[in-house]
Amino acid sequence: MLLGVLCAIMGVIYMVLNMQNSSYLLMFNLFSTQSVNFNLALICDKVSTSFLVVVLLISSCVFLFANEYMSEDHYNIRFGWILISFVASMGILILSGSIFTLLLGWDGLGLTSFALIAYYDNYNASSSAFLTLMTNRLGDVLIIATFSVILVTGLTVHFPPYTLVWLSSILFTIASFTKSAQYPFSAWLPAAMAAPTPVSALVHSSTLVTAGIYLMIRCFMVDGAPAEMYSLMGLVGSITCLLGGSVALFEYDLKKVIALSTLSQLGVMMYSLSLNLPYLALLHLYGHAMFKAMLFLGAGLILMMSYGTQDLRLLGSLLYSSPIVISLLNISMLCLMGFPFVSSFYSKHLILEKMLDMNCNFFTSMMFMLGTLLTGMYSIRLMKFLCWGNNNNKPSYCNMSWQSKMSMFPLAALAVLSGQLMSYLDSSYMTFSWSTNQYNLILWGVLFLSIFFGIVMKFGNFYPTLMSSMMFLGPTSYNLLHYTKSLLIYMKRIDLSISEPNWVMSNLMYSSSWRVMSLFNWLTNYMLVTWFLLVWLMIMSILMW
């Protein structure tokens, strides 16, 4: 209820700021040196308030759903407080007007996401939480390095122009890659599915994974980026979109398919930023947040019906047992595909038009187009499994409570209407394209070709062993977990209260000293070839721009 009231208040503030076209900066001076003032700065403009409205709206729906989903959990009160802290950290990051405030929200997101992913007491949840934490720590180091570069060059600790210091722009971009799960930092995103489903709905829609995209959008609005950064972001975004779609096409875990679709859409947003279209990326972020939250809430209802079964081969014929849930999921899938007259159509289709209209790299454009084709294919595949697949699990009948209805129906309405609604509210989201009819026919052909392939293709047992293993995420996930393996053992001993703190810390420091070296000694022959090819592709992409 409180989040709903805050959402309404922020909505009114957004309308006032949008009509006045004004911004406000609130600063609290912490301390000063001879040349630098360290301030806690909060910026309130139409971008930050609109994104905060989206976060609070989705959070209120997720909390309403979690009240029923976690009702039988013995520690649901603790879960609720951690989730509130997670939303508060995201709010601080959204309103941050300086790098000092940004670090406060960034660290808060990292710590609370660690606690939420490790909520269930098992090895899979603990290892996934450590993987997420270590990836975010890499981003923390890069943000602090950016902070140091800005201080050395004599700039302010507020967001400086992005092109002013080339080194700081590189560090800040790579830090955003870690938070937005761009390749090669994508390993933690599927692993975060070990968290409860309400956490997944909040993380994958509007909070943790979109934080990096939002920060880059905020910097792009101050000033553009160096030309080299556009090439790098285009290459990384197209690779992320392509790899996320290719793995989701052969995955049988329901939640992982949805997580990999998030990975694919994050690549779309990054590619939009590489075209210097920050407002269009923000519009796609808003639409994606709505239908992805509804998609995860629908998956949570399916898990409640099937007693926790996530294998798509055991689920099927849900169209007859729970037509309302499947109808809402199908709406989400149509939004994911960019079907006409839904929210993502007004952003995703326009991104593709601008890509064809602008002088873009041919190599990255083809990868991005192929990733878009795979998006429609795995969406149709998921709909086929859930609606018309063989029912081998005998799920119970789903009688949706009022809490489930109140949490999903507003998201369903906004998933369809948010794209056109945001264009009406703010003309900044309107981007015109002068592409020819031939280009439009190509885009429509890609959409309907993906639907056709998704309907007619049959997937054998050979493909999952090759593609759904996510072998391209192996280096980062294996080595980060290898680094924290000793931490998992010592945490278990601390929980059992069978060790003295001094003994734990001495062994921990001894083990971590050589574990750090293992991070740099993992280049075996096959991985050396993989990284050589990746570096070669990046160099060729920059040269061909």
Curated annotation (Swiss-Prot):
Class of this enzyme: translocase
Q: Main localization of the protein?
A: mitochondrion
Q: Name one Pfam family in it.
A: Proton_antipo_M
What reaction does this enzyme carry out catalytically?
Answer: a ubiquinone + NADH + 5 H(+)(in) = a ubiquinol + NAD(+) + 4 H(+)(out)
Entry GO terms, CC? mitochondrial inner membrane
Q: Which spans are transmembrane here?
A: 1-21, 47-67, 79-99, 100-120, 141-161, 162-178, 195-217, 230-250, 263-283, 285-305, 322-342, 360-380, 406-426, 442-462, 525-545
The membrane topology noted for this protein in its Swiss-Prot or TrEMBL record is:
Multi-pass membrane protein
GO molecular function per UniProt: NADH dehydrogenase (ubiquinone) activity
Q: Where in the cell is it found?
A: Mitochondrion inner membrane
Question: What biological processes does GO assign it?
Answer: ATP synthesis coupled electron transport; electron transport coupled proton transport
Q: Does the keyword Transmembrane helix apply?
A: yes
Q: Cite the entry's keywords alphabetically.
A: Electron transport, Membrane, Mitochondrion, Mitochondrion inner membrane, NAD, Respiratory chain, Translocase, Transmembrane, Transmembrane helix, Transport, Ubiquinone
- UniProt EC number: 7.1.1.2
Q: Which superkingdom does the taxonomy of this entry point to?
A: Eukaryota
So what does this one do? Core subunit of the mitochondrial membrane respiratory chain NADH dehydrogenase (Complex I) that is believed to belong to the minimal assembly required for catalysis. Complex I functions in the transfer of electrons from NADH to the respiratory chain. The immediate electron acceptor for the enzyme is believed to be ubiquinone.
Family, per entry: Belongs to the complex I subunit 5 family.
List, alphabetically, the PANTHER family matched: NADH-UBIQUINONE OXIDOREDUCTASE CHAIN 5
What is the protein name given in its UniProt record?
Answer: NADH-ubiquinone oxidoreductase chain 5
Q: What is the organism field in this record?
A: Albinaria caerulea (Land snail)
